[in-house]
């Protein structure tokens, strides 16, 4: 298209006459006609005036850049926010970020209204841009004066701030170890499956379900065939799935059990001296993005963007103190029976890729507790000893102390669990590490060494049901051994476990127990 053709095209598209163009350019209408017939060319001043009249760039008029290219040059390229997975859009969780920053001691209260205002916007590119600004604000915010906790994420600082009387390595009784390792594996798997059927349910509907199915207080698996029809149709929780004891012959995959198998594979490949970067690379290599949630999915996406640990845990990650690292602790306890120091160190190297502060401590604590449970028969003492491996002035220690103080003070079981739910709103903190750790500790103490009672209490209380019962079952299974886990818990799935791990798929639990011993002796 010639320059004359373009002048004619834009003039007619704008509904302008030659006379009006001539008047604006201070030329005759005959001059405009000559421009359009390419018998003469407008001066530079006239080209500039024409581009203003047509509201286009000068190069679009003079060089011949078409409309599509002009729009592309002006536009920004953005993702389709409606297609992103829930946990991938930082701006969707700005109030989670605000609350998280506030709780970890940052002086951000003056920005509360701003966070709320941006949170109310619809998802589009400018909301994400505003989210980036808010992220910079909280990242660089100072700590509040007189904040009572000290919660480092650096391992050297963690070790400086823990109890110096932490226990040394103690050799386990080899004649009992086979039973203990099997108990830990099955304890975790059965507990996870018990809570998986109703993962995400709120306590009002959970209590109604248990009562209407004759399972209150909870004492057995949930069966699909027992759920009342009106609950299937009208409940807020979606019961329409097949993760029920009467519908399976193999434990379905779940992130809580995926990680246990995944980290066995990690140790096989990298050995006991693996590094955080090894874990990050292994995540990408061995599982799809859909296998990760909240902090883990954020970290996974950060790996792809080029962030390495520990930055991968910190960049636009409002879930950095959620439960995701805590549920990854178990295998490090399994392969270090009686050696909580090494178990906690391994847990740190894993946790730091996706979590900070109490998110890290949750994994370190339960790795240490499981290692201690291999050589300690007193649950109260084991809980106390494991606390010594994390910072003593942390919110995590405070949470555990709230439970142990109630237990030691004779507070009855019902009251203790009620206090947990009164402290933490289940809609806001359902997946946060602190309330769920409280539930696990209370379940272990008030469960009185009874496997069924312990995992059922962990589920019946609500919040992150599968995570809590899995962790409680793992700790108690290690302490009491496989003989303490009744057949009613193990029989529905025939020793088989499904995973989402590439190249692994369905596994035989017995084989995984055998590999654990290889790693203990590695």
Q: Where are the language model's segments positioned?
A:
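Short alpha-helical DNA-recognition segment
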Residues: 15-34
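DNA major-groove recognition helix of helix-turn-helix/homeodomain DNA-binding modules
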Residues: 45-60
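Short, charged recognition helix plus adjacent turn
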Residues: 63-72
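An N-terminal structural lobe/cap that precedes and organizes the functional/catalytic core
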Residues: 163-190, 194-255
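Catalytic phosphate/nucleotide-handling subdomain of diverse soluble enzymes
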Residues: 190-196, 201-217, 355-371, 440-512
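Accessory "access/gating" subregions that flank catalytic or transport cores
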Residues: 160-174, 297-323, 329-343, 347-353, ...
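A short, Lys/Arg-rich alpha-helix, primarily the initiator
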Residues: 1-13
């Amino acid at each position: 298209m010639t320059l004359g053709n373009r002048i004619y095209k834009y003039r007619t598209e704008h509904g302008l006459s030659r006379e009006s163009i001539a008047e604006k350019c201070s030329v005759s209408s005959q001059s405009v006609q000559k421009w359009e017939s390419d018998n003469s060319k407008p001066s530079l001043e006239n080209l500039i005036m024409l581009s203003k009249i047509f509201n286009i760039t000068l190069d679009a008029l003079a060089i011949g850049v078409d409309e599509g290219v002009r729009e592309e040059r002006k536009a920004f390229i953005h993702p389709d926010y409606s297609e992103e997975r829930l946990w991938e859009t930082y701006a969707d969780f700005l109030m989670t970020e605000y609350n998280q920053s506030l709780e970890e001691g940052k002086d951000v209260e003056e920005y509360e209204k701003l966070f709320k205002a941006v949170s109310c916007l619809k998802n589009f590119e400018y909301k994400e841009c505003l989210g980036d600004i808010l992220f910079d604000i909280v990242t660089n915010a100072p700590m509040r004066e007189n904040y009572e906790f000290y919660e480092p994420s650096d391992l050297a600082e963690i070790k400086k701030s823990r109890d110096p009387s932490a226990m040394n390595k103690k050799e386990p009784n080899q004649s009992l170890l086979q039973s203990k390792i099997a108990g830990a594996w099955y304890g975790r798997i059965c507990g996870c499956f018990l809570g998986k059927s109703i993962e995400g349910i709120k306590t009002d509907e959970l209590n109604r379900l248990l009562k209407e199915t004759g399972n209150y207080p909870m004492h057995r698996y949930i069966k699909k065939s027992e759920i009342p029809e009106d609950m299937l149709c009208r409940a807020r929780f979606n019961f329409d799935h097949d993760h029920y004891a009467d519908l399976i012959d193999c434990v379905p995959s779940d992130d809580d059990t995926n990680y246990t198998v995944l980290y066995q594979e990690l140790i096989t490949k990298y050995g006991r001296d693996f590094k955080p970067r090894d874990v990050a690379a292994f995540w990408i290599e061995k599982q799809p993005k859909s296998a990760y949630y909240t902090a883990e999915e954020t970290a996974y996406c950060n790996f792809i963007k080029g962030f390495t640990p520990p930055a991968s845990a910190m960049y636009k990650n409002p879930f950095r103190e959620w439960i995701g690292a805590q549920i990854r602790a178990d295998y490090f306890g399994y392969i270090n029976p009686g050696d909580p120091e090494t178990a906690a160190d391994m847990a740190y190297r894993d946790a730091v890729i996706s979590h900070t502060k109490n998110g890290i401590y949750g994994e370190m604590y339960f790795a240490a507790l499981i290692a201690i449970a291999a050589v300690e028969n007193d649950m109260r003492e084991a809980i106390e000893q494991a606390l010594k491996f994390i910072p003593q002035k942390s919110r995590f220690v405070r949470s555990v102390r709230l439970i142990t103080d109630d237990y030691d003070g004779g507070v009855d079981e019902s009251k203790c669990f009620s206090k947990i739910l009164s402290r933490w709103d289940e809609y806001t903190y359902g997946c946060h590490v602190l309330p769920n750790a409280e539930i696990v500790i209370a379940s272990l103490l008030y469960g009185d060494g009874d496997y069924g009672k312990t995992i059922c209490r962990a589920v019946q209380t609500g919040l992150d049901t599968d995570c809590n019962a899995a962790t409680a079952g793992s700790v108690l299974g290690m302490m009491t051994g496989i003989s303490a886990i009744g057949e009613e818990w193990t029989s529905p799935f025939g020793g088989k476990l499904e995973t989402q791990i590439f190249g692994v798929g369905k596994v035989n639990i017995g084989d995984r127990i055998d590999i654990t011993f290889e790693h203990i002796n590695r």
